[in-house]
C-alpha cells in the first residue's frame, strides 16, 4: 500500500490509573463514519526515514533502555506463555477470555512497550531470549487480535465503548501505527475501524468536571482529571494516524478541550485568550484544587496527580506524527509538579521525600494510597517530564535528580529476578495489571527522552492543523 510522506516538523515533547467511575458525559450520537473498505488508506505511517530511530546515548539513558528491554523479556516469555498461554493458542486471533479491563488493558500496554522497542531499533534478542522476528510476530498477533475483537469489527459482542477503552484502544492503535509497514491489509482495516470508532464517541461528548464554576463539587471524591486525560489519547491517536479524515477537526477540537480541562484549576476560566484555539472562558469547571493537588478515590491522591501524563504523553505522539505539540497537553503541569515536590500537605511534610536536601525514591501519601506504597514508574515518568518540559523551575530539587533516584530503585526491583518481572509481592502494587503498567511507562519514558535528545521538539499555542503533504 502506498502511503503519503509528510514533512516532519520538530516538536516539543507525556498512566492512566485504575478505574474511576464512568463519566456522565454524553457521547456522540451521530459521528461521521467512513467505515468503508478503503478506510486504512487514510492512514499515514510515521516518517521513520526522517525520525531515524536509534538507541539513546548516555549512561543513565541506556539504563532506561535496559529497563524497557527487561520488561520486554518478561512480556514475551513468562507473561505471554505462562500467564496468558498465548503460545498454546493456534487460531489466527487470540482468545483474551473476556472483553473487560482485566482482559484487554494488559495486552494493550504490552504491545505498546514491545512496538516501541522494535521500532526504535533497541530490541535485543540476547536480553529477551526471543528473536526479533518472533517478537514482531507475537506483537502483531496481539495487535491484530485487539483490533479484531473490538466492537467496531464484532458488533455488540466485542470490547469497547467502556469507561477507559479510549486508553486501551489508543495504545493498541499506536502500537499498530508504529508497526504499520508490517501489518497485513486485514489488520490495518480493523485497526483503523477500532480507532475511528473510539474517537468518534467523543465528538459530541460533554466534558466532565469535579467542581463547577461556583465552587460546588459535582462528583465528590472523584476528580475527572485523569479521565479527561486518558480519553484525549484516542482522539490524538486518530488525528496523527488519519490526518485527512473528515472528522479530523472535530477530533482535534475535543482533544484540545479534554487536555485543557483535565488539570484545570479554579479560576482558569478567567485566563485571557485561548490555548490551541480553545478559549479559557469555555472551561466549565475545574478538576484540581488551587494548590495543584487532586482528590480521587476520596483522598488527596498523589498517583492521580501524576496522571496528567495521560495528556502530556500526547505531546510526543503529535511529534511522531510530524506535528507541533500543543501547549494544551501540558496545561498546569508545572502547578501539579510543584505541589508534588514542595507543597507542605500534612505535618510539615511534602509528598516527594528528600533526605538532607537530596532526592530519594520514597513517597509520602498524606491520606494513604489504595494502590500500594512502592510505585515508582509513574513518579519516574513525571520527573522525566518535569525535566524535559521545565515543570520543575520552582522545585527545590529538580526533576532529573528525582528521576535518577527512582531509577536506581526501579533497577534494583527489576534485578530481583532473571525474568524481567518488576514486582515480587502484591502489596508493592495492588493494581492487577501492574507489570503491564510498568511496560508502557518505560516505553513512554524512552520515547520522550529520545525525541528530546534528537531535538525533535517544538510547542505551539496556535490552533493545530494537519501536517502538510510533501
Task: Mark where each language-model region is.
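Extended amphipathic alpha-helical scaffolding regions
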Residues: 75, 94, 195, 403-410
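Non-catalytic carbohydrate-binding regions of carbohydrate-active enzymes
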Residues: 265-277, 322-444, 458-469
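Bacterial N-terminal signal peptides
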Residues: 5-15
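Conserved adenylate-forming
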Residues: 444-453
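Low-complexity, Ser/Thr/Pro/Gly-enriched N-terminal "stalk/linker" regions
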Residues: 22-121, 125-147, 269-270, 278, ...
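Aromatic-lined, polymer-binding surfaces characteristic
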Residues: 99-333, 368-378
